[in-house]
Amino acid sequence: MIDWRTKDLRNMGMELALETQEAIENYLLRGWAPGGYVESMLAHDYARAFACADTANRLTIWVLWRWITESAPPLCQGSYKAIKMWRDDLGGCRTDYVKGLEQKAIWQKLSTV
């Protein structure tokens, strides 16, 4: 449901590992714990993120940073407290995000008919 295609990055051969994409999608859509590396990036704890990242993620850490800063919902990032609130769907923040994505996907499908 999340479009990971970023033309300028893919043209340079830079793309997030599928496992990382999956972890972020599961976190954003279902509230699942994203794991040490992704959670650290979302919390803006970059020292921990570098320590937790495997070799593939170290090569593309700036790709994830860029996606988070440009595309991730503001309420799902910035601190470990924000991550907990997102996972707990406090105030329906995650539910609202998912509904918005679903509506956008439906409108895109309808506009191509």
What are these regions (language model features)?
Residues 1-6, 18-21:
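Short, mixed-charge, low-aromatic patches
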Residues 3, 35-36, 88-91:
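Long, charge-patterned amphipathic interaction tracts in eukaryotic proteins
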Residues 60-113:
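Amphipathic alpha-helical binding modules
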